[in-house]
């Protein structure tokens, strides 16, 4: 996809904030605990390679991605850290992972048996690193029965495998109601207790667990996802227990400004009509950039002041009402701080009827990323 370097719309990524957030989490964990930095979905929209590089120099012990292609992109850019693919990979493509030293999630005995048979023919030069997924209640992927899990562990003794880890994922760790979370913890403990010897990476904690359930962590590794990017996994349901700093800000600038006469309408559908003469500015950003079309009627920040979006958000542009004349080139903040005011990813998510995760990951590759750090 074309990257809009010649357009004044950018996602500002603060790598110092990323580093700070990792250290904030690390200092409240037991000594020798490992952090896996979750960099799937283009590092939650912030840029896979720069974020992965920063995470690995800031205390992370490894990386997590969603699909094998993301892991191979890391390898192609010289990042050789332990990298776990959290989703299911086909048995055939697992040979590629083995050669690249990429760790795969496996959630069934059948998958292991198929790879075992394939390896007898293909004879891979390296063992496949495996993390066994435990479905303790998420209902997505993983072993649900201890007996099948133990059979899988036994099969991992074969030379074509390396039993590197085991993990689960909590469905409600970001909820004030802890009942279902506690049920999942109990199921997880059953799987852990079934092994006489644990693999090097044992991880049960996601971002929410690391924030609100640290006392329950009976593992040596935590996966740091949305919290690494300075966002609250619960939205506003639970108060943050760490001093997290937002990593990304979405900014643009005024590309065109004019005085709109009373009675004139703006944008598709003519849904907004000026009641009096007013200043109107156009911004070079739209829903094709990941700024939701449903934000019509919401607000942005200009010179520390909230300004309303006028009319419908277009594919590539949008219009805003100004309190007074501002020249072309004036900065506009769509997500982030301006003066004493701020629009957060959670603010945008609430307006759009979604979660802050989706706001970040929907920012398209057409939006140029600018990375800032002090060292």
UniProtKB/Swiss-Prot annotation:
It catalyses: L-alanine = D-alanine. Substrate binds at residues 140, 315. Keywords: Isomerase, Pyridoxal phosphate. Pfam families: Ala_racemase_C, Ala_racemase_N. Disulfide bonds: none annotated. It comes from Limosilactobacillus reuteri (strain DSM 20016). Its cofactor is pyridoxal 5'-phosphate. Pathway: Amino-acid biosynthesis; D-alanine biosynthesis; D-alanine from L-alanine: step 1/1. Belongs to the alanine racemase family. One of its GO terms (molecular function) is alanine racemase activity. One of its GO terms (cellular component) is cytosol. The modification N6-(pyridoxal phosphate)lysine is found at residue 40. PANTHER family: ALANINE RACEMASE, ALANINE RACEMASE, CATABOLIC-RELATED. Signal peptide: none annotated. It comes from the Bacteria. Its EC number is 5.1.1.1. GO terms for biological process: D-alanine biosynthetic process; peptidoglycan biosynthetic process. SMART domains: Ala_racemase_C (SM01005). SUPFAM superfamilies: Alanine racemase C-terminal domain-like, PLP-binding barrel. This is Alanine racemase. Catalyzes the interconversion of L-alanine and D-alanine. May also act on other amino acids. The active site is at 40 (proton acceptor), 268 (proton acceptor).
């Amino acid at each position: 996809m074309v990257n809009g370097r010649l357009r004044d719309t950018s996602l500002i990524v603060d790598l110092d904030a990323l580093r700070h957030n990792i250290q904030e989490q690390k200092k409240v964990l037991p000594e020798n605990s490992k952090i896996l930095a979750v960099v799937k979905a283009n590092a939650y929209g912030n840029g896979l390679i720069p974020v992965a590089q920063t995470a690995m120099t800031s205390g992370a012990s490894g990386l997590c991605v969603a699909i094998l292609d993301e892991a191979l992109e890391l390898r192609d850019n010289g990042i050789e850290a332990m990298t776990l693919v959290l989703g299911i990979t086909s048995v055939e493509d697992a040979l590629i992972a083995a050669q690249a030293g990429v760790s795969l999630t496996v959630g069934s005995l059948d998958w292991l048996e198929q790879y075992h048979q394939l390896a007898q023919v293909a004879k891979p030069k390296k063992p496949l690193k495996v993390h066994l997924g435990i479905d303790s209640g998420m209902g997505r992927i993983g072993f649900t029965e201890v007996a099948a899990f133990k059979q899988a562990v036994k099969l991992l003794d074969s030379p074509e495998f390396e039993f590197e880890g085991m993990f689960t994922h909590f469905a409600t760790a970001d909820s004030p109601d802890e009942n279902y979370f506690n049920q999942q913890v109990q199921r997880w403990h059953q799987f852990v207790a079934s092994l006489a010897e644990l693999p090097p990476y044992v991880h049960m904690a996601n971002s929410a667990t690391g924030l609100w359930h640290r006392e329950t962590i009976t593992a040596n590794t935590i996966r740091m996802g949305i919290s690494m990017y300075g966002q609250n996994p619960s939205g506003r349901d639970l108060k943050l227990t760490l001093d997290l700093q937002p990593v990304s800000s979405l900014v643009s600038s005024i590309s065109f400004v004019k005085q709109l006469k009373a009675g004139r309408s703006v944008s598709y559908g003519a849904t907004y009509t000026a009641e009096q003469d007013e200043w109107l500015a156009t911004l070079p950003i739209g829903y094709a950039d990941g700024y939701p079309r449903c934000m019509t009627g919401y607000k942005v920040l200009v010179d520390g002041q909230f300004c309303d979006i006028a009319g419908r958000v277009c594919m590539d542009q949008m219009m805003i009402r100004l309190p007074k004349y501002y020249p072309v080139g004036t900065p506009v903040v769509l997500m982030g701080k301006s003066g004493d005011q701020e629009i957060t990813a959670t603010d945008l998510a609430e307006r759009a009827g979604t979660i802050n995760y989706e706001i970040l990951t929907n920012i398209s590759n057409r939006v140029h990323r600018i990375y800032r750090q002090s060292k």
